[in-house]
A protein has these predicted regions:
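Amphipathic alpha-helical assembly/interaction segments
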Residues: 1-95
Length: 95
């Protein structure tokens, strides 16, 4: 996968998560907070990968890529929580 393809995929992931949070997560204070955490993490994946593409050194590249990977893992956690807590049916949070 090329850097441009990964850039497009991370952006699509962020947009898909925003739509999911708006349309499929039932609104109440707890769910809203979980949806906010998920949206923050997912959009940070896309923003973080763009930062990776602008890295000025190998060390900077590795550091920024690590941050983007952490945000991706956090996104997965929030999706798992939504699924396993019964807030959203499992079919909505599976790939």
């Amino acid at each position: 996968m090329t850097p441009d393809e990964l850039r497009a995929r991370t952006k699509k992931f962020a947009v898909d998560v925003i739509r999911f949070a708006k349309e499929d997560v039932p609104g109440d204070p707890i769910n809203d907070e979980i949806a906010r955490q998920l949206t923050d993490a997912a959009t940070s994946v896309a923003a973080g990968y763009r930062a990776v593409c602008r890295a000025r050194s190998r060390a900077d590249f590795i550091y920024k890529l690590g941050n983007a990977i952490e945000e991706a893992d956090e996104s997965a956690l929030w999706l798992e929580i939504l699924c396993e807590s019964g807030i959203c049916p499992g079919h909505q949070t599976s790939p």
